[in-house]
Amino acid sequence: MAEEQQKAGHSNGENIIPPEEVAKFLPETVEEGGWEKCWEDGITPWDQGRATPLVVHLVDSSSLPLGRALVPGCGGGHDVVAMASPERFVVGLDISESALEKAAETYGSSPKAKYFTFVKEDFFTWRPNELFDLIFDYVVFCAIEPEMRPAWAKSMYELLKPDGELITLMYPITDHDGGPPYKVAVSTYEDVLVPVGFKAVSIEENPYSIATRKGKEKLGRWKKIN
């Protein structure tokens, strides 16, 4: 497990606001100033202050593809650094300058620094010269308006190499109204990913969910097949 994650972490996972509560106040903040405003004002209930426990497990168990990896909506950069290694170069992507400044401040002196980078770009329009072997999405799908999900799937397809892998941590699987975060289901991922050329390799419960998210998450692993 990456030592930097433990030093930077300020949350034990118990104070993360459940989606049914976040949905009551976060939309107003997003509407007023966007995600940048959230980061400027410190209204980031989705930020665990450390790497996602599932990501740490996948890294420690050598269960992630090597090569180039992308973490869209990387925020404070915790998962980016957890994934980074000499065999895996990770790009953390976000539209918030404040989020990326925080990430750089936290991890700029990390021993892993040469194995990751942070980029301020729009996931829906950014197309780098080199594609990715792996993309990990936890927060983008549930944060965007539901009508944008087909465009999300299209971007995933265009950013992955042939036979690349998309890992989705599906959250929140709840019945709450409104958002962000907007409620999701396995079918909402299937409905947009399968038509563009993805195949589900596995859909499983997340045994490493933090306390407030237990029973509300599933791990999906998808392969780009055409």
Curated annotation (Swiss-Prot):
This is Thiocyanate methyltransferase 1. Belongs to the class I-like SAM-binding methyltransferase superfamily. TPMT family. It catalyses: thiocyanate + S-adenosyl-L-methionine = methyl thiocyanate + S-adenosyl-L-homocysteine. Transmembrane segments: none annotated. It is an enzyme of class 2 (transferase). CDD domains: AdoMet_MTases. Keywords: Methyltransferase, Phosphoprotein, S-adenosyl-L-methionine, Transferase. Its EC number is 2.1.1.n4. PROSITE patterns: SAM_MT_TPMT. The lineage of its organism: Eukaryota, Viridiplantae, Streptophyta, Embryophyta, Tracheophyta. Ubiquitous. S-adenosyl-L-methionine-dependent methyltransferase. Probably involved in glucosinolate metabolism and defense against phytopathogens. Highly reactive to thiocyanate (NCS(-)) derived from myrosinase-mediated hydrolysis of glucosinolates upon tissue damage. Also accepts halid ions as substrates with a lower affinity. It comes from the Eukaryota. Signal peptide: none annotated. GO terms for biological process: methylation. It comes from Brassica oleracea. The modification Phosphoserine is found at residue 85. S-adenosyl-L-methionine binds at residues 35, 39, 46, 73, 94, 122-123, 138. Optimum pH is 8. GO terms for molecular function: thiocyanate methyltransferase activity; thiol S-methyltransferase activity.
